[in-house]
């Protein structure tokens, strides 16, 4: 898909060697490209949080609490797989790390409500056995969506999940069970609530404080207070698959920016069904295909300057285009991936081109709105903006036009917002208003608390892998051992 390219006017000397060159300007806004680059660098500096040893320990304590909670959920009714494989992503659902609808999500703000956010994909069904027949029924769904029939599963699985299915009786007397995203989410929220209630009856020293538990559509959002930090976990029940869906097979035949940088096996190692339906889909039955695991791999091939431009652009549009709901950060992420395919790698690798990339992303987004066309990166025949009204797309296109006319001012506003969020976080840390956790060296307390070696190990992982997504393998019968996979490395 062809999209608009960034507009920039290279310096010229008016044909006279003895005259100084003009500064490089953005043709549309007149902004100096050098100034835009500096503003993006300043935004990046304030947006990226540095973790000291205490913060690293708090991150691990929160993660361990969440995994322990999920282990107890599994033991409630044995529905979840005994040895499960979670995908932990840095950034919450509202940040666009997964293609989920944001309409039903409560608004949380960094600094006001939380300091760090994560998304955790938790397989309710883990279909990794290639001998397990699976029926993805796409006859009733829009592109990139599917129903999941349990008809070919064993009786034990059907019996276990029957209360989370919609049941369809056929004329021939056969009964079909369709795994219901809404019923699974209801069960998951109820189970988590029961477990948290039990945990809070027997509080242990150093245990995180559960500040908020809310069901946002099909997502369960938990905010934990740990030491001086508040951490938001958006927990999403999913169906996990190995391999690659047939509907996305043609995408593999095309040339892509990641060719030769990572292997095809890394990209197509698996996919998910996430609990979201299409605009006209049946909420109780329809799931959305998600390639979150593949996106973790693709992210490794994106230049730092393009990623900085993406983060700055996301910060600008996330509030500007929040009402009416039409554009999510995931749309912007898809456009960035298309840009990586479209543009030469050596162009995208230039460190001082963040301003050009930011302007290009704004142009691309406006182009997509005006044409009401944003193809899914993995299933291009799926237009993610198809359902929007002409009135909505033109409203947002006009808002983006104001950004494009003065990108520097909108960058300054984004910088002020992130600085204000950081000030709120620092103020909370000074007040020490959340539950304090003991230091690893302190005497007494729960013997299962992380020790100093674990804190140092976690700090090392965080330092060496800033912003990376983490896969976690966990056995609910043994949650005391770390089970990290950061990209393709195991720890």
Swiss-Prot record:
Segments for region (Disordered): 431-452
Gene Ontology molecular function: cadherin binding; nucleotidyltransferase activity; protein-containing complex binding
Taxonomic superkingdom: Eukaryota
Entry coiled-coil feature ranges: none
UniProt keywords, alphabetically: Nucleotidyltransferase, Phosphoprotein, Transferase
Family, similarity comment: Belongs to the mab-21 family.
The keyword Chloroplast belongs to this UniProt entry's keyword annotation: no
InterPro entries (alphabetical): Mab-21-like_nuc_Trfase, Mab-21_HhH/H2TH-like, MAB21L/cGLR
Gene3D superfamilies to which the protein is assigned, alphabetical: 1.10.1410.40, 3.30.460.90
Physiological role: Probable nucleotidyltransferase that catalyzes the formation of cyclic dinucleotide second messenger in response to some unknown stimulus.
Record protein name field: Nucleotidyltransferase MB21D2
EC number: 2.7.7.-
Compositionally biased residues, Polar residues: 431-442
Modified residues (Phosphothreonine): 435
